Amino acid sequence: MMNPHVQENLQAIHNALSNFDTSFLSEDEEDYCPLCIEPMDITDKNFFPCPCGYQICQFCYNNIRQNPELNGRCPACRRKYDDENVRYVTLSPEELKMERAKLARKEKERKHREKERKENEYTNRKHLSGTRVIQKNLVYVVGINPPVPYEEVAPTLKSEKYFGQYGKINKIVVNRKTPHSNNTTSEHYHHHSPGYGVYITFGSKDDAARCIAQVDGTYMDGRLIKAAYGTTKYCSSYLRGLPCPNPNCMFLHEPGEEADSFNKRELHNKQQAQQQSGGTAFTRSGIHNNISTSTAGSNTNLLSENFTGTPSPAAMRAQLHHDSHTNAGTPVLTPAPVPAGSNPWGVTQSATPVTSINLSKNSSSINLPTLNDSLGHHTTPTTENTITSTTTTTNTNATSHSHGSKKKQSLAAEEYKDPYDALGNAVDFLDARLHSLSNYQKRPISIKSNIIDEETYKKYPSLFSWDKIEASKKSDNTLANKLVEILAIKPIDYTASVVQFLQSVNVGVNDNITITDNTKTPTQPIRLQTVSQQIQPPLNVSTPPPGIFGPQHKVPIQQQQMGDTSSRNSSDLLNQLINGRKIIAGN
């Protein structure tokens, strides 16, 4: 009989599950053992070791019964397992057949889903078949040509004299450009051949970066050496989602960084942009068998072979040394001029001190062939039989003419300035001022002493002192002339303002009288008396206190003065100022 406590728990679980929508649960879902998380077969699904209904696989049941640490109890209800309580459900042949068909259908669906997943992965990776990825531990070097046969090139380059000094090398692949014969003309081929294209796979990225930093842009035996990161592609087995059978496969088997990846279309666009910006690139394929002395002299202006599609600076270096190669000694590296462009590969200088470093790369160094393109393609290019001096001279003149026309066009483009470009004009102005101030030169400045005489100089007022100014004892009568001018034009309208102005001047005059010297001429008291008589108001007008002669008091005073004596007072004042005496009018 089932434990009442367990029965209540099962009933509560059943009631709780009845409140949830279980339609999304599939009957085809595979059952797993709750203990070992392994799929349960048909016999396990029909095996009930405990009356509570908690099912486990037969392996876990035997483990619980035989392991003394597990106490032989049910994980759900903690009831002691007993063989008498074990219940088996026997399936009929029809039920067994249906169960097996169900399992077969599940397995088929599982395989179908796995196939779809692989197809989706292949579809997602299909576009990677034409993608090239920069491999940071792979270095591609062009222009190197050691004086050894082709069979010994790889071991020689792997030695400590060459690239072995930069770190551990896992693999070297040499792309043969020109053949090396064993006859007496081998030195001639070595001297004029363009060199090999070598792929060097280092053990670490730092070793590859150090190799590029020290080798790129140097000259070895008069030949320009270029080094850059090599590019590779994805393994075909990786693209199909299959394991790669080649343990030494050098292709990628994992997704690369997007910043280091580019496809053929992007590469073509970069080449077009570089050709438009950098002009026409001149390349030369093959080698020369018969070159005379005059032809070799005229060929100094020609460009050497450049795998990157851009002109090489080797043509401008006339002082390159061409040592004899009778012995296979260590090559001499000569620093090259810094080529134009930036560092597209992002090479960072390591802490290890290096010599003859040139981190600048040509912007078209991404055009280097890939490792896949060079494997199995060791073809021998055709050679040129004879180059005459006439052809060389014609090519040289055409090259110089094209460069001259491009230079004129560039100068014309630089000379034109937009007059409406405010920012450009401001920058030019600042540049001009900075240039003038940076190149400022001291210029001595002297003033001639005979420009003015001493008498004129003394008459000039001092800038900081008034000691040299002489006080004038004679008045210019400027105030009187101003009053005459005002009264002659409109004597009635300006009477009040003139009286107010004279009263304000009277205060300053009285102050000046106390300061000036006591020895005055007889004319000065008469003149002061005359001015005081002029500013006396009429008898019938009360003198207002000082400070009330504002604009608001002008109208009442003017109305009092505009009686029958207004015109007579104006005439008296005018005659007094003109004749210098006072005329008293009768009442």
Curated annotation (Swiss-Prot):
Covalent cross-link Glycyl lysine isopeptide (Lys-Gly) (interchain with G-Cter in ubiquitin), where: 270
Q: GO molecular-function annotation terms?
A: RNA binding; ubiquitin protein ligase activity; ubiquitin-protein transferase activity; zinc ion binding
Which reaction(s) are listed as its catalytic activity? S-ubiquitinyl-[E2 ubiquitin-conjugating enzyme]-L-cysteine + [acceptor protein]-L-lysine = [E2 ubiquitin-conjugating enzyme]-L-cysteine + N(6)-ubiquitinyl-[acceptor protein]-L-lysine
Which enzyme class, named as a word? transferase
State whether keyword Ubl conjugation applies. yes
Q: Which InterPro entries match?
A: CNOT4_RRM, Mot2, NOT4_mRING-HC-C4C4, Nucleotide-bd_a/b_plait_sf, RBD_domain_sf, RRM_dom, RRM_dom_euk, Znf_CCCH
Q: Where are the zinc fingers (RING-type)?
A: 33-78
Residue stretches in coiled coil: 94-128
Q: Where are the zinc fingers (C3H1-type)?
A: 229-256
Segments carrying the region annotation (Disordered) are: 370-412
Please provide one cellular component term from the Gene Ontology annotations of this protein: nucleus
CDD domains this protein is in?
A: mRING-HC-C4C4_CNOT4, RRM_CNOT4
Q: What else is known?
A: Present with 4280 molecules/cell in log phase SD medium.
Instruction: Report what the protein is called.
Output: General negative regulator of transcription subunit 4
Tell me the organism. Saccharomyces cerevisiae (strain ATCC 204508 / S288c) (Baker's yeast)
Organism lineage: Eukaryota, Fungi, Dikarya, Ascomycota, Saccharomycotina
Originating gene: MOT2
